[in-house]
Amino acid sequence: MGDTKVETISRLAQWRIENFGPCSFKKSDPFKVGIWNWHLSIERNRYLSVRLFPELSRVSKEQPPVAKFVLRVSNVGPNRRFYISPVYEKLLRTTDDCVWHVDSSFHGRFTIDVEFLDLKICPVNGGEASPVWPTDATMQSISTQTTLKCLSRMLEESILTDVIIHTADGTLSAHKAILSASSTVFKSMFHHDLMEKESSTIHIDDMSRESCMALLSYLYGNITQEEFWKHRLALLGAANKYDITDLKAACEESLMEDINSSNVLERLQEAWLYQLEKLKKGCLMYLFDFGKIYDVREEISSFFRQADRELMLEMFQEVLSVWKPV
């Protein structure tokens, strides 16, 4: 029948019924809102009963909808009347989950609207329902991604750069505003009467061009995991030198992930140099609690010749605490 079709636009679905006539039940064709196909149905007994329910499918079974919506029934004609339901918020699975009884009888042509105010997916195994439509968090994520793409282009294409960085083996272009926002040290360079402010140049002679590019990629938000992993020791030094605390913390976490016998002494030295307490404890635990000190017997003499005396004292105290007789 022609009057079983439901028209949709955005979050509104409208079912125009040309003639309900003497029949006591009518069901609409499926219509899609969100990720589900829906049906409306009407039935006349003592009341006009309007039902909203999802089409039985794998999607509605595995990802049942939690819908917040309003129903409205109106007749067509000069004496138009509107009947508006309460705002429902329900988990909808079957035809009986939402039944709205309208205390009026409609004859001839009338319209049923359903306006979805919100739609969420209810986890079958419990937990918090997840929204189908964009939320503030979603829009924030989209905005962040767009901003990062713009920053990436600014760096890669040298768009309106205003500072030159001289590294050990080449030069790079950057933006004073980005550097200043990321580092109090860079900010001080450009806000006081220092050489960097006058010449619009920065000398970072203790970093290669490749490592410095990794630093800029981090500050501009487009560094890759591979790039970070490759240059993390150089990045750690730069983070400490230029007071980039979040980068310093990220480097420490990364260096904690792959401590082994071939790098533990080097990591311990880095931890002491840059005051990385978590990394230092991790290295000492690896050496003494787990007994890996025996695996570095050949390297330990050279390490002790170069190590800071306070670090050596701390290592000795760690030995005493681990091997303390019961």
Curated annotation (Swiss-Prot):
Pathway: Protein modification; protein ubiquitination. PROSITE patterns: BTB. Signal peptide: none annotated. Homodimer. Interacts with CUL3A and CUL3B. The keyword Lipid metabolism does not apply. The keyword Membrane does not apply. Pfam families: BTB. One of its GO terms (biological process) is protein ubiquitination. This is BTB/POZ domain-containing protein At1g21780. May act as a substrate-specific adapter of an E3 ubiquitin-protein ligase complex (CUL3-RBX1-BTB) which mediates the ubiquitination and subsequent proteasomal degradation of target proteins. Residues 161-228 form the BTB domain.
